[in-house]
Amino acid sequence: MQRKLATWAATDPSLRIQRLLRLITQPEWLAEAARITLSSKGAHTPGVDGVNKTMLQARLAVELQILRDELLSGHYQPLPARRVYIPKSNGKLRPLGIPALRDRIVQRAMLMAMEPIWESDFHTLSYGFRPESSVHHAIRTVKLQLTDCGETRGRWVIEGDLSSYFDTVHHRLLMKAVRRRIS
């Protein structure tokens, strides 16, 4: 299904994908989202509800059915994220919100549906938070762009850092872009 979503999105950039809720609430889809979520290292870290991987796995089938019912009925409400502070190299603290595992499963299910749709819209040289890309891919691309058959072509590299970017994302504009692509 992800390939179909990617193909539809790439074929028609103005296409608005419909009925994603039906897709992400399919039992197999939620089960795969749970499998991926629970196989991550972070699954051992509980959210504000205190539920960890072991506790959730003990009642996974029931919890997935509850999530499905809540999503389909419109009654799903994510729990507040548990706030922790991670020390940064400059001595400051970075706030980190840790969602409950059930919310991470819903987020993963949404990612599995939305990522193939959005991938075709992103610039090919954009490397941040993309599947099959990393800092190493970006460095390799810059290196290739600066050399040609061993000869140096470019002399300038500009490093930039968008300070506290995720804290300053304009959510209204982001949601407007999402609504253009997904109904």
Predicted regions mapped to residue ranges:
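Non-catalytic terminal/accessory segments
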Residues: 1-183
